[in-house]
A protein has these predicted regions:
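Basic, polyanion-binding surface patches
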Residues: 1-160
């Protein structure tokens, strides 16, 4: 059971979305997402731009993790992981963070809370679907749309 404040944890503390592909692990910082219930399951929805390197990892895997770190302690690292691409360097190592695994799903060891998530649904945000055209203009003027992933929360790891 998740005991955090969803709005604070996602929107203000941020989260790391982490996945594995071909024996490698990549992560990215995200501050857009949802938690709720869909198809009778507790779910999380995350949004990943099509140009992000981490998207390749999430697309390749059945599961991914969401890690919540102490924002005050790790603000610099979270910002770095959201601006530097894993295409260019081993950014997890460079941020001085460590990867652990729950089964074959990687997560960030320093996290206070981790959700192991199994993908259920993916959809690209399409321009025609926007009712709020101001949001379309503000966030997607470059046409770099997000894919939305809905995933069931398989289990939660909490730091003791």
């Amino acid at each position: 059971e998740y005991k955090g404040n969803v709005f604070n944890d996602i929107g203000k503390k941020w989260m790391l979305i982490t996945a594995a592909k071909d024996g490698k692990v990549n992560t990215m910082t995200a501050s857009w997402g949802n938690m709720g219930v869909m198809w009778g399951k507790d779910i999380v929805s995350v949004f990943i731009r099509q140009t992000r390197f981490t998207k390749e990892f999430v697309d390749n895997a059945d599961c991914f993790s969401i890690s919540f770190l102490d924002h005050e302690k790790y603000a610099k690292e979270l910002s770095y992981l959201g601006t530097v691409s894993g295409r260019d360097e081993d950014k997890i190592n460079k941020a001085n963070l460590h990867v652990e695994f729950s089964g074959d799903v990687p997560y960030i060891e320093e996290a206070d809370d981790v959700m192991i998530c199994k993908k259920m649904f993916r959809q690209t945000m399409e321009p025609d679907a926007f009712i709020d055209k101001e949001a379309l203009e503000k966030w997607y003027s470059d046409k770099n749309y997000h894919d939305m992933y809905m995933a069931s929360i398989e289990h939660i790891l909490e730091k003791k």
